[in-house]
């Protein structure tokens, strides 16, 4: 799903992209889907949002491998990590995109029960309702 804000458009493709990264099928799918919207040689930042110690296990993150693959395709790639609490991960990712000057924010979309979303927060919901820039969500 590509969500465009009234004041933002992607005419000609995205030049600066922030991809929310986690070792999940949804995040990987979203990252691959975003390449269809990226301009040749676009700047891409892979951002991991760390909200608990288990999220930061060294050696278990594939974003470096994906960054290498993107580099080989001619993209200018960087990786970063942001710390967040469980209830502000979406806002943290939006902040990373704004700091990077991104014209597209990409993330995997997760579907959970309403109770689950209420208890831990809904990153997907935050991205849909709070992002001032275009968002690509893939599931």
Descriptions of predicted regions:
Residues 1-41, 45, 130-139:
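Intrinsically disordered or low-complexity boundary/linker segments at protein termini
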Residues 1-10, 97-139:
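Gly/Ser-rich helix-loop-strand patches that form or flank binding pockets
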Residues 3-4, 45-50, 79, 106-109:
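Short beta-strands and strand-loop turn motifs
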Residues 14-15, 30, 55-60, 90-92, ...:
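Short, well-ordered secondary-structure micro-motifs
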Residues 23-73, 80:
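Redox- and metal-dependent alpha/beta enzyme cores, enriched for Fe-S-associated oxidoreductases
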Residues 62, 88-94, 123:
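Short acidic active-site motifs
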Residues 66, 93, 127:
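Aromatic/hydrophobic pocket-lining residues that form π-stacking "cages" and hydrophobic walls in ligand
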Residues 79-87:
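Short beta->alpha junction loops
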